[in-house]
Amino acid sequence: RESGNHPFGALLAGPDGEVLLRSGNTHKDDKGTGHAEMNVARAAAKAYAPEFLAECTLVTSVEPCCMCSGGTYWAGIGRVVYGMTEKRLAELTGDNPENLTMDMPCERIFDAGQRKVAVVGPVPELEDEIARAHEGFW
């Protein structure tokens, strides 16, 4: 909160589970496009071969939005794990203009593509903890 950024985080795990990249939200500098998942997807696409990324996992606090799902798909990342649904996020953010959500599950975005992206989430054991980071923020 002190950084001026929104409470989201993402990381890229390699096939062996090693954390390769991580990022928070960069709203302060990048406004609406500085989502943690997009930051990781852009860095991953620059740093790694598509064949390697197909075996990697994007782990994110909240279900990727449409933009982040597209970025993940185009970067070639093969798997997504998220903690809390975007629908639950919308309940926490309301109509805050800094985080207007779209009711579009990431699976629908990935299912429209020609390449399979596996999705795991939400993670019920983490949802309340993730939600606490948003309480009072919006």
Predicted ranges, named:
Residues 8-17:
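Short beta-strand scaffold segments in enzyme catalytic cores
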Residues 1-3, 71-138:
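Zinc-dependent deaminase
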Residues 20-27:
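Short beta->alpha transition motifs characteristic of CBS
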Residues 14, 31-37, 122:
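A structural motif shared across PLP-dependent enzymes of the aminotransferase-like
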Residues 33-71:
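Short HxH-centered metal-ligating active-site micro-motif
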Residues 6, 52-54, 76:
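Short loop/turn motifs at secondary-structure junctions
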Residues 8, 54-56, 117:
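Residue-level recognition of the N-termini of beta-strands and the immediately preceding loop/turn
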